[in-house]
Design a protein with these regions (language model features):
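Serine-dependent protease modules
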Residues: 1-161
Length: 161
């Protein structure tokens, strides 16, 4: 399979191809061609992260301060050295972005490397190594009608939904 490591610069997407030596059998398939939803979730879960954000509101409080708005979302690790793919709407306008790895109570400060609101994609970077990147398939190899499974963390609680 081929995984992509994406970096965004303004509205331009830069993709580096990273060769992965994982096949369906090695990932837990019983027939060598497909995996159950449970198997997919088991393989993907270590790569799913919780993202929390804070943004200063443009509205002032009664006493002259500013409101802090909180947000939460999901991301997926795309490289061992801390690059994470998420949706741009999760981090757009955030003054603080934190990432929590699956199975860990520790959170990392994240830097938004780039984002594109038109395609709703963003790349974050955390200072960590030895991470488990997701195995990203080739969408050109799919046929109309094949099952697709989305594994994520939409509420920011790592509930493995």
């Amino acid at each position: 399979m081929v995984a992509s490591r994406a970096g965004l610069t303004g509205n331009q997407v830069v993709v580096q191809q990273v060769e992965r030596s994982t096949d369906a059998t090695a990932a837990g398939s019983t027939d060598g061609t497909s995996m159950s939803v449970q198997q997919i979730a088991s393989v993907a879960s270590p790569s799913v992260v919780a993202i929390t954000t804070e943004q200063m509101s443009s509205s002032q409080t009664w006493f002259g301060g500013y409101y802090v708005q909180s947000g939460a979302g999901s991301g997926v690790i795309i490289s061992q050295d801390g690059y994470i793919l998420t949706c741009a709407h999760v981090v757009n306008g955030a003054t603080s972005v934190k990432v929590q790895l699956n199975g860990s109570d520790e959170s990392y400060d994240a830097t938004v490397v780039g984002q594109d609101s038109t395609s709703d994609i963003a790349v974050l970077k955390i200072d960590a190594t030895g991470l488990t990147p997701a195995v990203i398939g080739d969408s050109d190899a799919l046929a109309v009608g094949e099952v697709a499974v989305a594994v994520g963390n939409p509420l920011g609680t790592l509930s493995n939904t």
